[in-house]
Amino acid sequence: MDLQAQLEELKTKTQEALKQLNGDHSKELQELRVAVLGKKGTLTELLKGLKDLSNDLRPVVGKQVNELRDFLTQAFEEQAKVVEAAKIQAKLDSESIDVTLPGRQMKQGYRHVLTQISEEIEDIFLGMGFQIVDGFEVEKDYYNFERMNLPKDHPARDMQDTFYITEDILLRTHTSPVQARTLDQHDFSKGPLKMISPGRVFRRDTDDATHSHQFHQIEGLVVGKSISMGDLKGTLEMIIKKMFGKERKIRLRPSYFPFTEPSVEVDVSCFKCGGKGCNVCKKTGWIEILGAGMVHPSVLEMSGVNAQEYSGFAFGLGQERIAMLRYGINDIRGFYQGDSRFSKQFK
């Protein structure tokens, strides 16, 4: 058989072999490529026969060899695409998803106990005609201290260790600045001011079971004509009874806050022993729950409110303390660790 006939036979056999490799036969395809086009392949061996051809026939057969090489190279490339597509399809078929199977269930989250406490308190005050006012966590020293009757170098500032950002900018130590800003804007010709300001506050405390560098407060303020200590006591009694039960009683003890005068600490009768004395109330029958008092005249005057005509009361309570008392939580750090198992207890 002459060289030209052998070349045609190689072309025909290679085409037939390629047709057999329609599935995932990448290994077989590579072996066939090496056998036909490799350095020791069939086409290379046939090329060696060119030297035995006449001078007239050698260029003709040489051209035929080059054309065959190009043809077979393209044929192998096209078949490689077919084999790769078959390989991908086989993988897809083996890894197909049954859409009728139930999906993976997401773990259910729970509303944080502090969120629940805050919303409960807010609902109580909304029902009493109060408005809810939000404020800035990053506050000016002027509003955080001076407007609360705490001028620079006032000794009472030592009561609150503060995170200062600059000399005049700080992380608020209470939500009272919201009250000062609201007093500045309120139009008393339209009626008294009744507001609460919930939010997060910051103190330079060392974190332990009962202290945290951040915690939550809800402070309340009522300012109008003829507001008295009796109004304060009545408001606090209503709040305590709604939160801890109708049988709860309160008592007021004299205290000191720079922004109220007179100032009181508010105790609630122990909800564990009913006032008989236990480990929760330290055998006293009473639990300290919040601080309050009549708004200091200086605080009113700094907002342009006539302290001779208007009076008011203010109070502040902590959501963490209420939650710890209500649910017997003995470590405040649990509120901030982001553990869903903790929140699940209070769903």
Swiss-Prot record:
Subcellular location per UniProt equals: Cytoplasm
Complex formation: Tetramer of two alpha and two beta subunits.
Q: Which cofactor does it need?
A: Mg(2+)
Binding, Mg(2+): E261
Key word Oxidoreductase present in the record?
A: no
Q: Which residues form the signal peptide?
A: none
List its EC numbers: 6.1.1.20
- Reactions it catalyzes: tRNA(Phe) + L-phenylalanine + ATP = L-phenylalanyl-tRNA(Phe) + AMP + diphosphate + H(+)
Protein name per UniProt? Phenylalanine--tRNA ligase alpha subunit
Alphabetical list of InterPro entries matching this protein = aa-tRNA-synth_II, aa-tRNA-synth_II/BPL/LPL, Phe-tRNA-synth_IIc_asu, Phe-tRNA_ligase_II_N, Phe_tRNA_ligase_alpha1_bac, Phenylalanyl-tRNA_Synthase, tRNA-bd_arm
Cofactor binding, per record? Binds 2 magnesium ions per tetramer.
Q: Which organism is it from?
A: Streptococcus equi subsp. equi (strain 4047)
Q: Name one GO molecular function term.
A: transferase activity
